[in-house]
Swiss-Prot record:
The keyword rRNA-binding does not apply. It catalyses: N(6)-carboxybiotinyl-L-lysyl-[protein] + acetyl-CoA = N(6)-biotinyl-L-lysyl-[protein] + malonyl-CoA. Component of the acetyl coenzyme A carboxylase (ACC) complex. Biotin carboxylase (BC) catalyzes the carboxylation of biotin on its carrier protein (BCCP) and then the CO(2) group is transferred by the transcarboxylase to acetyl-CoA to form malonyl-CoA. GO terms for cellular component: acetate CoA-transferase complex. Acetyl-CoA carboxylase is a heterohexamer composed of biotin carboxyl carrier protein (AccB), biotin carboxylase (AccC) and two subunits each of ACCase subunit alpha (AccA) and ACCase subunit beta (AccD). Gene3D superfamilies: 2-enoyl-CoA Hydratase, Chain A, domain 1 (3.90.226.10). This is Acetyl-coenzyme A carboxylase carboxyl transferase subunit beta. One of its GO terms (biological process) is fatty acid biosynthetic process.
Length: 307
């Protein structure tokens, strides 16, 4: 009698459970990191990935950011240059080319930047958004080329350039080729400044490493989303190095605002209105040359190549 009972309990019953099991989507609910509150995924998505009640700002895809910003959620994608996929033939636990394939399949993007041209509050604007889901939004040759192409688009169309930064820093798989994007993007920002075009940076969670050390902190105005981690080295690394406990909220948007590194902390729902107003004011000011000065050239020298 033992064998039939084992067969029933080990084979028949699991099959019955599987047969009548009710399918529940894995992404039906979203859990708030602050309060543990469970919210419908669709409700959070409709709220621009802000948890209702706690107002916790979750990570947001690059495409969702452009849709949130541009009037009627429509824009023209700026074509981005192609770069060598794996010039160093890098391999750690996986080959770099395999990591790229996985990231592209996961995000549907060729790399960690998406750039669009459209209107925000009826004002023409060029917007670049980093995709943290693509290898932590790390900066490589493709990212550097994308940022520069966005700046060139803003120069060509005479629009403000807005960046939504979200990155873990330089992409280690590209070595020095990644690091050289830091000065290249800095030159692109200088070209915008020479042409008297606004460059607005929105620091989102997280913005760290080489991105913080370059174009993310070179804006005319720095906005930040609530609670965003903004730093070069993260708090855990610093605590392990100095063997001391850091202050509460250290390197968060509000802390940086209090210490003058961020101009304003803005709720995600107010970003479009705030950026539209800022860019409108800056464009009005910069259209008029200062008394006694000649207009700045709008086509400065071309940037150096990525490689």
């Amino acid at each position: 009698m033992v064998e039939p009972m084992n067969w029933i309990s080990e084979v028949v019953r699991p099959r019955i459970k599987t047969l009548f099991k009710r399918e529940t989507p894995e992404n039906l609910w979203v859990k708030c990191p602050d309060t543990g509150q469970m919210v419908f995924h669709k409700e959070v998505e409709q709220n621009h990935w802000v948890i209702p009640g706690s107002e916790h700002h979750l990570k947001m895809s690059a495409t969702a950011r452009l849709k949130m910003m541009f009037d009627e959620g429509t824009w023209i994608d700026v074509p981005l240059p192609e770069v060598p996929a794996d010039p160093l033939k890098f391999r750690d636990e996986k080959r770099y080319v395999d990591r790229l394939k996985e990231a592209r399949a996961k995000t549907g993007m060729p790399d960690a930047f998406k750039i669009g041209f459209g209107r925000v509050g009826s004002l023409p604007m060029t917007i670049a958004a980093q995709e943290f889901g693509f290898m932590a939004g790390s900066l490589g040759m493709a990212g550097g080329e994308a940022f520069v192409r966005g700046a060139e688009t803003a120069l060509e169309k005479r629009t403000p350039y807005v960046l939504f930064a979200a990155s873990g820093g330089a992409r280690m798989q590209e070595g020095i080729l990644s690091l050289m994007q830091m000065p290249r993007t800095t030159v692109a920002v200088r070209r915008l400044r020479a042409a008297r075009l606004p460059y607005i940076v929105v620091l989102t969670n997280p913005t760290t490493g080489g991105v913080t050390a370059s174009y993310a902190m070179l804006g005319d105005v720095h906005l930040a989303e609530p609670g965003a981690l903004i730093c070069f080295a993260g708090p855990r690394v610093i605590e392990q190095t100095i063997r001391e406990k850091l202050p509460d909220g250290f390197q968060r948007a509000e802390y940086l605002r209090e210490h003058g590194m961020v101009d304003q902390v803005v709720h995600r729902h107010q970003l479009k209105e705030t950026i539209s107003r800022l860019c409108g004011l800056l464009m009005d000011v910069r259209r008029t040359p200062e008394p006694g000065t000649a207009p700045e050239p709008t086509t400065p020298e071309p940037l150096p190549n990525a490689a």
